[in-house]
A protein has these predicted regions:
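Small-residue-biased structural context
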Residues: 1-178
């Protein structure tokens, strides 16, 4: 998939685009092939952590701004939450699947496809609409707040991607950014 054109006319868009680039780099690293199952598991742990952090910070900071600023904000957030739930289900399936299983790579590929589609939609529609609705000053403030929260979030404590990894990472990010 070719990368969507990135809109960076405010700090919020710039911070979200940074997150998207970080996520895409991890996806490309996975897609380039990982020969060692332990390295694959570590990389998937990073992907899970980045996506969980993304969801937690969106729920806390971005979704309320969408609801306040866009006429259809509640509907937009409802759709975002449904998509987040689907990503969460996939993350849990991936965390519970051995890297040597024949279903592991197809699950990760499905996750990557869904997240890329959402990042593209975000670039094409949501970020321009939200930036316009918020205005430059508020979008810049929200972007700065999002960046501070992202920077305050811890790194994963270990590469152990076990059955409760999504909940564990969610708790780590939530606690550190409260």
């Amino acid at each position: 998939m070719s990368a969507p054109q990135q809109v960076e006319n405010n700090r919020l868009a710039a911070v979200i685009n940074d997150e998207n680039r970080e996520t895409e780099a991890l996806f490309q690293q996975f897609e380039s092939g990982v020969s060692d199952p332990e390295e694959g598991r570590r990389l998937v742990g990073e992907i899970i952590y980045v996506l969980v952090r993304r969801v937690v910070l969106r729920e806390r900071l971005v979704y309320p701004a969408i609801q306040r600023s866009l006429d259809d904000g509640d509907d937009v957030v409802d759709l975002e939450v449904l998509a987040d739930d689907e990503v969460g289900r996939l993350l849990k399936l991936i965390a519970d699947t051995p890297t040597t299983s024949g279903t592991f790579e197809p699950l990760v590929a499905r996750l990557i496809e869904q997240v890329r589609e959402r990042m593209g939609d975000e670039q094409a529609d949501l970020l321009p609409r939200l930036g316009e609705a918020l205005g430059a000053e508020v979008a810049d403030e929200l972007g700065n707040e999002l960046a501070r929260a992202r920077d305050a979030a811890p790194s994963p404590e270990s590469a152990d991607v076990g059955p409760d990894v999504v909940e564990r990472f969610r708790e780590q990010v939530s606690t550190s950014t409260s």
